[in-house]
């Protein structure tokens, strides 16, 4: 799944966002990770209740994240292939770390509201597969483009990688957004957003919790 995430960053997300395509590599343990690397570990069970995947800052401005397999598998998901996968959660975390590693960027919608720069959340329940040689298809997360955060973007623009969203600041039925409105931070869920995922958005270590408590 690391190779699928690397391909997604290099060929899809980084070019779309005008970012340098940072390497995504596998390490058997944190100790074997390259010096200075931002580590996203895949673990079986959450070390904090209701945490699906999160990343945060450690000392020295390094980013440290975790993805937990059990919540995905316990709710009908799979490891690599399907609509809900551990690889998709990893992809989601990698993508959002790429674009907003410090979880502090917001975009103004032109009407006084500010939307969190979380590129996976608005289309969180949508995924696609990348074929990895020797492994087969691996699920990765859909993500929104810079046009999604631009209130002046026209309807002819591409707002997400899979083309499911038709206007800026809109989410799919299985999406989620964090919005600052009149000085208050709010969370909005799509009509089919799973209840088990909602609880995880409130986990103390989630990106969403960091948004809503700062």
What residue ranges belong to the model's regions?
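Sec/Tat-exported extracytoplasmic proteins
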Residues: 9-17, 93-94, 98, 102
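Zn2+-dependent metallopeptidase catalytic core
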Residues: 1-24
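Metalloprotease/metallohydrolase-associated module, dominated by Zn2+-dependent proteases
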Residues: 47-48, 55-63, 69-80, 84, ...
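Short alpha-helix carrying the canonical HExxH Zn2+-binding catalytic motif
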Residues: 82-95
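Short, well-ordered secondary-structure micro-motifs within conserved domains or adaptor modules
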Residues: 23-55
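Broad hydrophobic/π-residue packing in well-ordered secondary structure
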Residues: 9, 13, 51-57
């Amino acid at each position: 799944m690391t190779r699928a995430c690397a391909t997604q960053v290099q060929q899809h997300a980084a070019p779309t966002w005008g970012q340098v395509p940072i390497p995504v590599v596998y390490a058997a343990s944190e100790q074997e990770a390259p010096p200075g690397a931002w580590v996203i570990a895949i673990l079986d069970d959450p070390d904090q209740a209701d945490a699906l995947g999160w990343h945060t800052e450690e000392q020295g401005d390094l980013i440290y994240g975790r993805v937990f397999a059990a919540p995905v598998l316990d709710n009908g998901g799979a490891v690599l292939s399907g609509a809900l996968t551990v690889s998709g959660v990893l992809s989601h975390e990698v993508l959002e770390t790429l674009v907003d590693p410090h979880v502090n960027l917001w975009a103004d919608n032109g009407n006084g509201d500010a939307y969190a720069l979380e590129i996976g959340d608005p289309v969180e329940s949508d995924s696609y597969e990348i074929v990895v040689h020797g492994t087969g298809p691996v699920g990765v997360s859909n993500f929104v483009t810079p046009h999604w955060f631009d209130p002046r973007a026209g309807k002819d623009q591409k707002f997400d990688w899979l083309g499911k969203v038709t206007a800026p600041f809109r989410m799919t039925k299985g999406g989620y957004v964090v919005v600052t409105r009149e000085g208050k931070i709010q969370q909005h869920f799509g009509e089919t957003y799973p209840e088990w995922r909602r609880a995880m958005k409130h986990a103390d270590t989630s990106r969403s919790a960091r948004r809503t408590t700062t």
